[in-house]
From Swiss-Prot:
It comes from Ruthia magnifica subsp. Calyptogena magnifica. Gene3D superfamilies: Fe-S cluster assembly (FSCA), HesB-like domain. Involved in iron-sulfur cluster biogenesis. Binds a 4Fe-4S cluster, can transfer this cluster to apoproteins, and thereby intervenes in the maturation of Fe/S proteins. Could also act as a scaffold/chaperone for damaged Fe/S proteins. Homodimer. InterPro entries: Fe/S_biogenesis_protein_NfuA (IPR017726), FSCA_dom_sf (IPR034904), HesB-like_dom_sf (IPR035903), NIF_FeS_clus_asmbl_NifU_C (IPR001075). This is Fe/S biogenesis protein NfuA.
Length: 192
């Protein structure tokens, strides 16, 4: 599934040797798998805390646990040890984690979701927010719901009109309008 270089194996095994925990393992996850915002994470874990979908991989000096739901995203990946100025750090090259941009003939919904994930949500994430597609009406109105720091934010109207709507209409000229159906009365997590 993925390859760990010999140097990286020695480095990880040494990290485990320094821990005072007998059953500790390395959990490899892909957060937001299949989206442009995907990221691979490495964390210490105890196997008993993992769901049954995690499979065990044995290496000299440690065990890695990977959710079988992430196997396709980690295919052809490589974990290596790289120089990081003051020392070394683990890096992963994972060409399949982010998924692929939809093809030209893909459904409009799929293409809009991709643009939201790839181009819009990374900007909103800097304020702890996100937007998601609710539906596309037969009249080509795009209905969205904001969440996180965008829900209840006093700037959401300008974010919608000048940011999200402008970007979606530029990418998809067939869109007639972009509407927000979020309940903005809840301001508990609002950015401003």
């Amino acid at each position: 599934m993925f390859d760990i270089t010999d140097e990286a194996k020695v480095y990880v095994a040494d990290l485990f040797a320094q821990q005072d925990e007998k059953d500790l393992g390395l959990k490899v996850d892909v957060e937001k798998a299949g989206t442009p915002a995907a990221v691979v994470t490495f964390n210490f874990c105890f196997p008993k805390e993992l769901s049954k979908t995690y499979k065990k991989f044995e290496y000299e000096g440690f065990y890695a646990y990977i959710d079988e739901l992430n196997f396709e995203y980690l295919k052809d990946s490589e974990v290596a040890l790289k120089d990081a100025g003051t020392g070394k750090k683990l890096t992963i090259t994972a060409p399949n984690t982010k998924g692929k941009e939809p093809k030209e003939d893909a459904p409009l919904e799929e293409k809009i979701k991709y643009v939201i994930a790839a181009n819009i949500n990374p900007g909103l994430a800097s304020h702890g927010g996100f937007v998601e597609l609710v539906e596309i009406t037969k009249h080509m109105d795009v209905i969205l719901n904001f969440g996180g720091g965008c829900q209840g934010c006093s700037s959401v109207k300008s974010t919608l009109e000048q940011g999200v709507e402008a970007q979606l209409k530029m990418s998809f000229p067939e869109i007639k309008s972009v509407r927000d159906v979020t309940d903005h009365s809840n301001t508990d997590n609002a950015y401003i």
